[in-house]
Amino acid sequence: MILLENVKKIYKAKSGDVTAVDNANLKIDKGEIFGVIGYSGAGKSSLIRLFNQLEKPTSGQITIANRVISAITGSELRKARQEIGMIFQHFNLLWSRTVRENIEFPLEIAGVDKAARRKRVDELIHLVGLEGRGDAYPSQLSGGQKQRVGIARALANNPQVLLCDEATSALDPETTDQILDLLLDINKRLGLTIVLITHEMHVIRKICNRVAVMEKGKIVETGPVLDVFRNPQQDITKRFVQQLTDSEDTNETIESLIEKYPDGKVVRLQFIGEAVERPVLQRLMQRSDIEVSILQGNIAQTNNGSYGSLVVHLNGEETAIQQAIEGIHQDQVELEVIAHG
């Protein structure tokens, strides 16, 4: 569906060339929700703007739906852009137009007749949950409602691809989840390919099928979200995963608890997919002559399945503890010893 081959974007500056995107290679499948995550300055905003040619690549090739979009210009590019919708962090609405008129705007530009425009706007207002707000102006809307207008406007021309540029960064956590649920629903209903960029791992976890991690203009890691959670390869990816699995408060709590358990071993168990539902600790206590104390635990749901971790204290004879650890490995649960007694 979307293919990036050796794509590079270089900006000219007085201080010298700035490489915002450095030889990016990506393949995004039709109908998937693909996330790009990175900290500020990583190059993710420049990357997503290459998809619809708001930015032109310095080199490389971008193909969307079998069309080399990086090689077209003029009316052909304008037509191609109608098949690529985009929503923004700060909504980019026309403040002098109502909700209906904002959604209708791209249809006007495309030359759609008035009756067809009215019908399409009605459909979109229903799709994004803005019934009764069609005559309101942006200044009368909440942040979440403004983004719903942005989504409806982006879908007006029935695009194949929806680009989301930090679409939830200006929203509170509850509204963020509502917008993410809406995007997930639209993806399922319409079979729409969604590409989103964010600096929040929560967004990736909640709705993305796969993720690419960017750092200093380079794509340093890609993969299914659950695989990245389970086994992050790069230091930056590990930091993003720790946003959800290990907060500073959690680490401080574990450290203080470890001091209370000078004997035995403190281990971290990681559960992926079906392993989350296995009674691992129950089996452990049934077959081992050791004491098991749960110090901390959490479970996160990704779009590919569940991911969980437990920090537990194992106390008993060294031989019994080692046998227990071997039994945990047999249950296909990853284990890391984080403190020895």
From Swiss-Prot:
Pfam families: ABC_tran, NIL. Keywords: Amino-acid transport, ATP-binding, Cell membrane, Membrane, Nucleotide-binding, Translocase, Transport. Residues 2-241 form the ABC transporter domain. It is a peripheral membrane protein. Gene3D superfamilies: 3.30.70.260, P-loop containing nucleotide triphosphate hydrolases (3.40.50.300). SUPFAM superfamilies: ACT-like (SSF55021), P-loop containing nucleoside triphosphate hydrolases (SSF52540). GO terms for molecular function: ABC-type D-methionine transporter activity; ATP binding; ATP hydrolysis activity. It catalyses: L-methionine(out) + ATP + H2O = L-methionine(in) + ADP + phosphate + H(+); D-methionine(out) + ATP + H2O = D-methionine(in) + ADP + phosphate + H(+). Its EC number is 7.4.2.11. ATP binds at G38, Y39, S40, G41, A42, G43, K44, S45. CDD domains: ABC_MetN_methionine_transporter. Part of the ABC transporter complex MetNIQ involved in methionine import. Responsible for energy coupling to the transport system. PANTHER family: AMINO ACID IMPORT ATP-BINDING PROTEIN, METHIONINE IMPORT ATP-BINDING PROTEIN METN 2. Belongs to the ABC transporter superfamily. Methionine importer (TC 3.A.1.24) family. This is Methionine import ATP-binding protein MetN 2.
